Amino acid sequence: MIVRSQIIGCGSYLPSRLVTNAELAAQVDTSDEWIVERSGIRQRHIAAEGETTSDLATNAALRALEAAGISGSAVDLVIVATATPDNTFPATATKVQSRIGMRHGFAFDVQAVCSGFVYALSVADNFIKSGQVQTALVIGAETFSRILDWTDRTTCVLFGDGAGAVVLRASRGKGSSADRGILSTHLHSDGSHYDLLYVDGGPSSTQTVGHVHMEGREVFRHAVINLAAVVGEALAANDLKASDIDWVVPHQANRRIIEGTAKKLGFPLDKMVMTVERHANTSAASIPLALTEAVGDGRIKPGQLVLLEAMGGGFTWGSALVRM
């Protein structure tokens, strides 16, 4: 018998304000057709004035806890994956910890940009497998609207705000791919490409927040190659084939990246959970947002095999294989 980290509840939160491509076309030199053709995005949610990453994270967390049927006091660990924290410190996770009524255990943030949720899931899984934690709350939450240059049509049209969360609980497994829970996680990074996707600000460099900068074509090329490799790694580690996977929940960066990865790996598009059209790229929040939607509408069912994959600035990339 071995310890597995089982997902027992999912939750998400999207700000109420919707911004369509038509609205952006009135502000910058772009059009609905241009945005849809290059990204597949038609709209995005934007946080209200005064609405912070911790607000989004807390709302998603409370919904995940409700779905799991537990209170915040039962949680031993909170990890928030974010590149847009409320403050330089303390960690956004500590704010969530307080707001959900968790008085023991520990909380911290993970920063791996768009790969952040997969990284955070892997960290929580290892804490559970080590026996230090029984129940963990893993959240991806972002307010990327706060770090966008709204005059730069190459970036401002691509991102949105939101949060998603899952509750993990220790369970017993037999050590096979039939076990429910996280079967494996696979993480990578390559800092030599940091200048292809970055924010030009920070406390120690400019003492400013800065804005997102991206070399889109280069990011696309690396994304398809790296994501295909890390998905293949997850399949090989569990002695599985692409046809064994019930659903793929990819990072929702761009429809073309999702389609390119699916084609390279031989996944039919109807196995790919896609929300990018309505949510845009919500960075670390995108996977748990999409996962929660697919669980909520009944597409993803208990016992099914789900593959999560993401790539972000750094570069960072990773995958997680989960039996729901």
Swiss-Prot record:
UniProt KW keywords: Acyltransferase, Cytoplasm, Fatty acid biosynthesis, Fatty acid metabolism, Lipid biosynthesis, Lipid metabolism, Multifunctional enzyme, Transferase
Record keyword Cytoplasm present: yes
Coiled coil, from the record: none
Metabolic or biological pathway: Lipid metabolism; fatty acid biosynthesis
InterPro entries the record matches: ACP_syn_III_C, ACP_syn_III_N, FabH, Thiolase-like
EC number: 2.3.1.180
CDD domains hit by this protein: KAS_III
Keyword Transcription regulation: no
Gene Ontology terms describing biological process: fatty acid biosynthetic process
Example of a GO cellular component annotation carried by this entry: cytoplasm
Stretches that traverse the bilayer: none
Record localization: Cytoplasm
Segments for region (ACP-binding): 252-256
Domain notes: The last Arg residue of the ACP-binding site is essential for the weak association between ACP/AcpP and FabH.
Subunit structure, as described in the record: Homodimer.
Annotated family: Belongs to the thiolase-like superfamily. FabH family.
Name this protein carries in UniProt: Beta-ketoacyl-[acyl-carrier-protein] synthase III
UniProt organism field: Paramagnetospirillum magneticum (strain ATCC 700264 / AMB-1)
Organism lineage: Bacteria, Pseudomonadati, Pseudomonadota, Alphaproteobacteria, Rhodospirillales
